[in-house]
Amino acid sequence: MNAISAIITAAGKNRRMRQDLKDRKIPYRHKLCLEIDGEPVLSRTIRNVLDAGVGECLVVLGHYQEELLPVLDEIDNQRLRIIFNPDRDVELSQTLLNGVLNTNSDYCLCVAADQPSVTTSTLKKLLDTLISSAEPENTISILARRTVGQLESAEGLGMPFACHRDILMRFLPRDADNLNPILRKMIREGVKFYGVPHQEEVELLNINRYDDYLKVLEHLKNE
């Protein structure tokens, strides 16, 4: 897997979690610093990605980077690289593009930092599916939300996914937007999409709100 660069986006505003914590009168912590079995969410996501066998793992920071850097400082792995958005107030596509521009590989594994419940096994499946596809340079292997296998629509889809760097370089510079509209544009313009099934329902969960965090904790407790 040395030909794979992982990009983890960790540059968002954390707006919904901040509001949830305020409403619940819980002391503020960045959602990526909340802990799962004593491990910060961000660290767990990074560990799952590194264990998938990638050659490098780029974490792209923007908003609230000062809160996340101490977590990253605790990770001792030469494959980990920290990238900073030049402008913090950008869309997700621009954060992802900043990561792509700093990669050293032909293929990219793209993951959101608030997806600690996506297992290493599922991430490996995304990579294996891409590399073994008939057209790896024109294919996106993506965690399926509804349909699995060959996809005709990107509705509801987002990270994690794996694809050739050139696909991202073709589409990301064209639109400063959230990711799903760009994925839908890719599929309209002939990029092949293959939906990989999840192993557990919780893998489909991004930790955006405090209830999401509690669901992840409950799932892990019952494992």
Locations of regions flagged by a protein language model:
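Conserved core of the sugar-phosphate nucleotidyltransferase
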Residues: 68, 117-211
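Conserved N-terminal catalytic core of the sugar/cofactor nucleotidyltransferase
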Residues: 1, 41-107, 120-121, 172-174
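Short beta-strand-to-loop acidic/aromatic patch adjacent to the donor-nucleotide binding site
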Residues: 106-114
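Short beta-strand/turn micro-motifs composed of small residues
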Residues: 10, 61, 112, 144-145
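N-terminal nucleotide-binding beta1-loop-alpha1 segment
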Residues: 1-26
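Short catalytic helix/loop segments, enriched in acidic residues and glycine
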Residues: 22-44
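Alpha-helical elements of Rossmann-like donor-binding domains used by nucleotide-donor carbohydrate transfer enzymes
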Residues: 44, 94-98, 125, 129, ...
